[in-house]
Amino acid sequence: MSAREEWRKRFGCRNPRIVCVGLNYKAHAGESGGELPKAPLLFGKFSNTLVGDGDSIVLPPNIGHVDAEAELAVVIGERGSIFGYTCANDVSARDAQFGDGQWFRGKGFDTFCPVGSRIVPAAELDPSDLRIQQRLNGEALQDSRTSDLIFDVPTLVAYVSQVIALESGDLILTGTPEGVGVFREPKVALQSGDVVEIEIEGIGVLRNEVTA
């Protein structure tokens, strides 16, 4: 059973909606050269991007630079409530993302949203100050804390709820901290055979191998 099928079965949803938030860590907004956003910057991924822990991230042919983003994911439960939290990876094809001037294509390829298998119930975890890391082949690229978020989890859920009625199984990816490959010097891109790990304190590790 695929990760999408397991997700649908678990939450009774047809296709989960994946709402993402851009530039939501202060240091990441700084490394990108942009100003701090005055409101959450929302974009989305379709369910075709969803894969699970241990699944492969597949690099599209002739797409250029691709890198990973460590993210805390909010899992929505019944009636728009917060069911829990898990690890996620907002995989991004930067040449497409920046070349298009918008983010949908660069972040929308198949397998570009790995999500962890462990969901920690909301009542058991305070998301306001958790260590969040990305490791590539064992080397730490991102190492920050969710206390650097510009807009916290309650603010994001309330803001997104003004746009759509959130349903069970929907996901909100809350943004990524500084250290992503495209803004490093020299740049760090994913290559076939790489192993990406996203680890969040109190949740666990999401691990995926990269293939072409």
Residue ranges and their predicted role:
Residues 1-69:
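Extended, compositionally biased flexible segments
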Residues 2-12, 28, 34, 86, ...:
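Catalytic-pocket segment enriched in acidic/His residues
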Residues 16-19, 40-42, 48-49, 56, ...:
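Structural motif
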Residues 21, 31, 44, 53, ...:
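Short beta-strand-to-turn element immediately C-terminal to the catalytic PLP-Schiff-base lysine
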Residues 23, 89, 176:
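Short secondary-structure boundary segments
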Residues 24, 48, 79, 120, ...:
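Residue-level marker of positions within ordered structural domains that often coincide
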Residues 55-83, 87-94:
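Non-heme Fe(II) oxygenase catalytic core, chiefly the N-lobe of the double-stranded beta-helix
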